[in-house]
Amino acid sequence: MYKYLQVGKIVNTFGLKGEVKVIPLTDSPDRFSELNYVLLEDNLSQKLTIERYRVKDNIVIMKFREISSIDEALKLKNRFLVIERERAKKLPEDTYFICDIIGLEVYDLDGRKLGKVKDVLQTGSNDVYICQSYIGKKDLLIPALKDIVKEVNIEQGYMKIKVIEGLLD
């Protein structure tokens, strides 16, 4: 399990006084209201205190206390913001962080190894796990539904699925 979780990616500056545009990597951009600070993924010792933020067109405009000019803000471009896992919102039962799903081995209910999760597609209605197949050339697309995903064990690194017609084609 990862010790830090990504919550946003800085994609540009905003204005001249050090604000930045952040693509939120959380389900709710309002999540930032609960955070006093974030860290830079590539420099965990650099703490950025959130002075204020606002959401505009699914982008978060954020001001950090430590950044006061456009030149300083430019140095943050294309960097990821993270928080410590223990500061993350508690997830409902049977809900997982994407970073914990990626890398899981996928087995059918008979114990046959089918593949490994390499990405998660967020469709709106339900997530879809994209798995590198061990049994064919095409990736497996596994809907993240209780009828299909029967067990997820993050600690042991696997999930078990019920294979439905067409899933392995």
From Swiss-Prot:
Does the record carry rRNA processing as a key word? yes
Query: Which domain of life does the UniProt lineage start with?
Result: Bacteria
Query: One of this protein's GO BP terms?
Result: rRNA processing
**Which InterPro entries would you find in this protein's record?**
PRC-brl_dom, PRC_barrel-like_sf, RimM, RimM_N, RimM_N_sf, Transl_B-barrel_sf
Keyword set includes Chaperone: yes
Localisation per UniProt entry = Cytoplasm
Q: Which residues form the PRC barrel domain?
A: 93-167
Which molecular-function annotation in GO is an example for this chain? Answer: ribosome binding
SUPFAM superfamilies, per this entry?
A: PRC-barrel domain, Translation proteins
Q: Which Pfam families match?
A: PRC, RimM
Keywords (alphabetical) are: Chaperone, Cytoplasm, Ribosome biogenesis, rRNA processing
GO cellular component, as recorded: cytoplasm; ribosome
> Which Gene3D superfamilies does the UniProt record give?
PRC-barrel domain, RimM
Query: What is this protein for, i.e. what is its function?
Result: An accessory protein needed during the final step in the assembly of 30S ribosomal subunit, possibly for assembly of the head region. Essential for efficient processing of 16S rRNA. May be needed both before and after RbfA during the maturation of 16S rRNA. It has affinity for free ribosomal 30S subunits but not for 70S ribosomes.
The family note in this entry says:
Belongs to the RimM family.
Question: What is annotated about its quaternary structure and interactions?
Answer: Binds ribosomal protein uS19.
Domains: entry comment: The PRC barrel domain binds ribosomal protein uS19.
- Protein name per UniProt: Ribosome maturation factor RimM
Q: Which organism is it from?
A: Caldicellulosiruptor saccharolyticus (strain ATCC 43494 / DSM 8903 / Tp8T 6331)
